[in-house]
Swiss-Prot record:
GO terms for molecular function: FMN binding. Belongs to the NrdI family. This is Protein NrdI. It comes from the Bacteria. One of its GO terms (biological process) is protein modification process. Gene3D superfamilies: 3.40.50.360. It comes from Bacillus subtilis (strain 168). Probably involved in ribonucleotide reductase function. HAMAP family: NrdI (MF_00128). The gene is nrdI. Induction: Part of the probable nrdI(ymaA)-nrdE-nrdF-ymaB operon. Expression is constitutive but low, dramatically induced by thymidine starvation which requires recA. InterPro entries: Flavoprotein-like_sf (IPR029039), RNR_Ib_NrdI_bac (IPR020852), RNR_NrdI (IPR004465).
Length: 130
């Protein structure tokens, strides 16, 4: 099963990932070493920026990144969850979901489906049918 690695400032992202049911959930600042593919869930800071802690983590481990999801607040308009756009563009990975604050049950369902899809797609690339 895939690792979900998250970054959370106010607790919204942590509450979201805890609702997903995934077994391997770790926080960015608790990771000493990463050697398996992962999905990143982060927040958006300031005016649509990627948090420095997330960026620092990705500088080391982006080669294992399968996809990204981000939290935000819709009052920020075009900057809502914009960190996902930046990470997706910078590291050429799909945006799995954008959710407001700590997300709804529908957000959790959509995110879980997208994680399963990207993991299946990634596994097929790593283990092609002979």
């Amino acid at each position: 099963m895939v690792q979900i690695i998250f970054d959370s400032k106010t607790g919204n992202v942590q509450r979201f990932v805890n609702k997903t049911g995934f077994q391997q959930i770790r926080k960015v600042d608790e990771m000493d070493h990463v050697d398996t593919p992962f999905v990143l869930v982060t927040y958006t800071t300031n005016f649509g920026q990627v948090p420095a802690s997330t960026q620092s983590f990705l500088e080391k481990y982006a080669h294992l990144l399968l996809g990204v999801a981000a939290s935000g607040n819709k009052v920020w308009g075009d900057n809502f969850a914009k960190s996902a756009d930046t990470i997706s563009r910078q590291y050429q990975v799909p945006i799995l979901h954008k959710f407001e604050l700590s997300g709804t049950s529908k957000d959790v369902e959509l995110f879980t489906q997208e994680v399963e899809r990207v993991v299946t797609k990634s596994s097929a690339k790593m283990d092609p049918v002979k």
